[in-house]
Amino acid sequence: MELNELQQQRLAKLERLRAAGIDPYPPRTRRTHTIGFVLASFDQLMERGEQVTVAGRIVGARRILGKLAFAHIEDESGRIQIWLSRGDIGDEWFDRFRDDLDTFDIVEATGTLRRTQRGEPSVFVERLGVLAKSLNPPPEKWHGLSDIEERHRQRYLDLIVNPEVRDVFRTRAKIVSTMRRFLDERGFLEVETPTLQPIYGGASARPFITHHNQLKQDLYLRIAVELYLKRLIVGGFERVYEISKVFRNEGVDRTHNPEFTMMECYQAYADYNDMMRLVEDLYRTLALEVAGSTTIVFQGHTIDFGPAWQRVSIPTAIAARTGIDILELTELEPLQRAIRAVGLKVDLKPSWGKQVDEIFSVYVQPELIQPTFVIDHPVALSPLAKRRPDQPLLVERFEPIVAGMEVGNAFTELNDPLDQEQRFLEQGRAYDAGDDEAQQMDIDFLNALMYGMPPTGGLGIGIDRTVMLFTDQPSIREVILFPHMRPRD
């Protein structure tokens, strides 16, 4: 690895430390308190004259004023000033602090607590130690890394210099733990299903393919966990859920990353109306837990999770917005003629169902700001959902939409094995016609359904998009620690 000039200067300082018998990367520390604890208990510790040892990264500039020096160090819990006097710490370590230590080095400082003349809580250092010498200097503006792509490529540096980014991921962890507790308290059992699958299914998406050398078998990274969880419902578990990574070989944009986190849950003897109530309760709980209120702000919109969510029917909304009655135009060519006739600016799609979805996505969904259940999806887009008894072109399905963004998907699950087989066959014909997102025939899943699956409601929630909402982040990359990035040129 070639070092630039600044790295070489830091390497020379590291070598000086080693030459003096100082290990710049010792195996352990003598830390007695976190910085956050010291700050919270500062006056009591100071009154007792208690000696503390804190540890953290040097942040900001070090200042040397004759026989005095000071800097700030930071650990995960907080930031505190350390104050060094040549008389207290001795010539060797005072000079070493001045000459061999740098911003971003990780140190430990032992001393007593006092406030400066300006009242700033400080550790007056009696002993200093090096815990990790940083060979990389901070960015030019140490207090912030502003290049978005570099922030995502070097998330470790982003976390060092932008404390608010750490807060986003603390909130993410809180959302996941709250969601898990919410489901546990309602009797759902957390389970684990295969990541490597011989047949991919449960969503309309292109998979990532890998190969098992010993079995000489192609396998797929899961695009969803639905079909395995429904097998468990067949097996007698009545409420199950899984929080897991799923993988879809698709584009990268503001709301899509090829690797993302989903929560899927299934409840026997329930339908999509029960899942709607579950979603309302879940997001209300998340809002109260994360924001302390049912109201949040996302990208300038005030979102209220307190009231019941509105319901919007796809055919009704499209008719109101565009004048097109999709239930009267149930073939692709007449629908596309109507699109051209009224001058809709949408991409033309290869199937009726996808064309309906395109119209809705462009002309209706962006206007759905308050929490909304979008219902009445075409059966052609929903091969795993139960048909509406009164309208066989549509299914009992909803998508929760917040601030114009889809955050999940839910059905009354199709449990008729004969109907399911026909849906799979239709998907196979679509695949043969060029739809590489069509779902695959899964004989074993059909066999499971033939043993009988009770009426079941199923729900999938995108964790990443949910975190976007509750942290007011404009892009999914801001809520994934290590998002997928294009290779450097």
From Swiss-Prot:
* Keywords associated with the record: Aminoacyl-tRNA synthetase, ATP-binding, Cytoplasm, Ligase, Magnesium, Metal-binding, Nucleotide-binding, Protein biosynthesis
GO molecular function terms attached to this record: ATP binding; lysine-tRNA ligase activity; magnesium ion binding; tRNA binding
* EC number assigned by the record: 6.1.1.6
Please state what class of enzyme this protein is: ligase
- InterPro entries recorded: Aa-tRNA-synt_II, aa-tRNA-synth_II, aa-tRNA-synth_II/BPL/LPL, Lys-tRNA-ligase_II, Lys-tRNA-ligase_II_N, Lys-tRNA-synth_II_C, NA-bd_OB-fold, NA-bd_OB_tRNA
A Pfam family reported for this protein in Swiss-Prot or TrEMBL: tRNA-synt_2
Q: Which NCBIfam families match?
A: lysS_bact, PRK00484.1
Q: What is this protein called?
A: Lysine--tRNA ligase
